[in-house]
């Protein structure tokens, strides 16, 4: 899965963001499992990018929640 930028994420609906969040969390879990088994991941920067994208999604979801509550 390609890493999504903030402007791409802001164009998505809340449901799409939730789906991407679940998908990325699964991918991160797989990466962590492969790291635990194999020792060194095949792409060490991938875990960092997944974590950062998850943080972006959560930030944008919170922004959208705040905008609807105002």
Swiss-Prot record:
PROSITE patterns: RIBOSOMAL_L29. GO terms for molecular function: structural constituent of ribosome. One of its GO terms (biological process) is translation. The keyword Nucleotide-binding does not apply. It holds the Pfam family Ribosomal_L29. InterPro entries: Ribosomal_protein_uL29, Ribosomal_uL29, Ribosomal_uL29_CS, Ribosomal_uL29_sf. Signal peptide: none annotated. GO terms for cellular component: cytosolic large ribosomal subunit. Keywords: Ribonucleoprotein, Ribosomal protein. Coiled coil: none annotated. The keyword Lyase does not apply. PANTHER family: 60S RIBOSOMAL PROTEIN L35/50S RIBOSOMAL PROTEIN L29, LARGE RIBOSOMAL SUBUNIT PROTEIN UL29C. Belongs to the universal ribosomal protein uL29 family. This is Large ribosomal subunit protein uL29. It comes from Methanocaldococcus jannaschii (strain ATCC 43067 / DSM 2661 / JAL-1 / JCM 10045 / NBRC 100440). The lineage of its organism: Archaea, Methanobacteriati, Methanobacteriota, Methanomada group, Methanococci.
């Amino acid at each position: 899965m390609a890493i999504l930028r903030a402007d791409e994420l802001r164009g998505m609906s809340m449901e799409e963001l939730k789906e991407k969040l679940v998908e990325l969390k699964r991918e991160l879990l797989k990466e962590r499992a492969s790291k635990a088994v194999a020792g060194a991941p095949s792409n060490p920067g991938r875990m960092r990018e997944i974590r950062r994208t998850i943080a972006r999604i959560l930030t944008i979801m919170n922004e959208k929640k705040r905008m609807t509550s105002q």
